[in-house]
Amino acid sequence: MGETEGKKEEADYKRLQTFPLVRHSDMPEEMRVETMELCVTACEKFSNNNESAAKMIKETMDKKFGSSWHVVIGEGFGFEITHEVKNLLYLYFGGTLAVCVWKCS
């Protein structure tokens, strides 16, 4: 029975690590969900290269929602930005990886 409990805890931990935790967003619901899914896809696809993940997110956001999107991905950064209203998403993915996506033209 102890082995079964251990596997369940491990599965719960893995699910928590792959679920995006939104820290702040002022995006409309539909845009926020789409952007979250894009961030998860990019971070999983380029798990060892944050620069490539950020480039994928930026280029996709530019195509879908117009130009002037910016993306920062990393594990240790602070930020103070100017952004357009209803165009900011800040989330954590994988436990420690932070993603900030915003539009500023």
Curated annotation (Swiss-Prot):
InterPro entries reported for this sequence: DLC_sf, Dynein_light_chain_typ-1/2
Keyword Cytoplasm listed: yes
Recorded GO MF terms: identical protein binding
SUPFAM superfamilies: DLC
SMART domains: Dynein_light
Swiss-Prot/TrEMBL GO biological process terms: microtubule-based process
A GO CC annotation given for this chain: dynein complex
Gene3D superfamilies listed in its UniProt record: Protein Inhibitor Of Neuronal Nitric Oxide Synthase
Cytoplasm as UniProt keyword: yes
Family, as annotated: Belongs to the dynein light chain family.
General function of this protein: Force generating protein of respiratory cilia. Produces force towards the minus ends of microtubules. Dynein has ATPase activity.
Assembly description: Consists of at least two heavy chains and a number of intermediate and light chains.
Official protein name in the record: Dynein axonemal light chain 4
